[in-house]
Amino acid sequence: MALEQDQQIPRACPVSNAMPPPDDSLTDEPQTRADFLKYYCHLTLDANTAYRELRLSEGNRKAELTDLVQTYPEHPERFSHLFQVLCNEGLSGRCYWEVEFEGSIEIAVAYKDLGRSGYYDECAFGCNDKSWSLDLNKNHKCFRHSDEEVAVPEPRSSRVGVYLDHKAGILTYYCVCDTMLQPMHRVETAFTQLLYPGLWVAGSARLCDPE
């Protein structure tokens, strides 16, 4: 499958307990990367949701779009047409994770009942009311929810940090530049279900270990 970057590319679990925050009594938001890393959560990609041409490796911490159909079994939670994959872990409380990428990527969170069979409205990250997505595609950078877009700045690095405070309804994306975090977009809303981190990958993406 040859990818044409200028063409329209279709965009691309068992419930696990989210990592509890270090101290639920805290009400202030983290300020430094070291503060955010206190809420680091170890995530793994769910092979049962991965699009059939996404290859998972490194203990299901890396996803790469390939030209080959992978040997995944049929599964009702698999994305049928989009280059997407969800994590195994459903998150609540305060959580932080980082993603390093090459090529085009969308870094999302979604409810478990996000659609899986088909293309956009019910399945694509950010095109419905069940998912929120930072889209860093080749010629288009935006945040998307319910198919509404907000432009975001060009990231200065290939690593993005995501901070979730589920109870407070806060979702914030950061560009990670060494020890500095540069805000890219912030959401304040009300989350009603566990949130599953997800990736749409036209290139490669890795869930990072804390450093």
PLM ranges: what are they?
Residues M1-E211:
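Beta-rich ligand-recognition domains in immune and ubiquitin systems
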